Amino acid sequence: MSKASGFLKEFRDFAVKGNAIDLAVGVIIGAAFGKIVDSVVKDLIMPLVNYILGGSVDFSNKFLVLSAPDGYAGPMTYADLTKAGAIVLAWGNFLTILINFILLALVVFIIVKAINAARRKEEEAPAEPAAPPEDVVVLREIRDLLKK
């Protein structure tokens, strides 16, 4: 067998194994789930925070200018300041990402907790005793007949 065909066989064995496929599915679902959490934060939670705080609070545009370039007179937006070389602490973006992470971790925790509870329930359920083999049944019948 040539090295190339051996390599291809080894790769096929790796790719077809359940663990590699499970990992690939998990990564794809995780990426999609991350987008859902991001949308929940941006489209549901942040509008509620804005409503509660009584204004238009967009944390992603909150920042602190640590050092602006000398003589800078342009717009005081995060994108323009960083483009001009300012040192900017983007605390609002960090806060938004932190909220995303906390929500994602909370949802994963709830899912894992539910799965563990289902597994415990499955383990706690007493298994029905297996039916005795046919030869044991016949021997018991013979024993019972001999007792009579």
Curated annotation (Swiss-Prot):
Record's keyword terms, sorted: Cell inner membrane, Cell membrane, Ion channel, Ion transport, Membrane, Transmembrane, Transmembrane helix, Transport
Topological relation to the membrane, as annotated: Multi-pass membrane protein
Protein name in the entry: Large-conductance mechanosensitive channel
Location in the cell: Cell inner membrane
PANTHER family per UniProt: LARGE-CONDUCTANCE MECHANOSENSITIVE CHANNEL (PTHR30266:SF2), MECHANOSENSITIVE CHANNEL MSCL (PTHR30266)
Pfam family, one: MscL
Transport recorded as keyword: yes
Purpose: Channel that opens in response to stretch forces in the membrane lipid bilayer. May participate in the regulation of osmotic pressure changes within the cell.
HAMAP family assigned: MscL
Predominant localisation class: membrane
Gene that encodes the chain: mscL
UniProt GO MF annotations: mechanosensitive monoatomic ion channel activity
Record note on quaternary structure: Homopentamer.
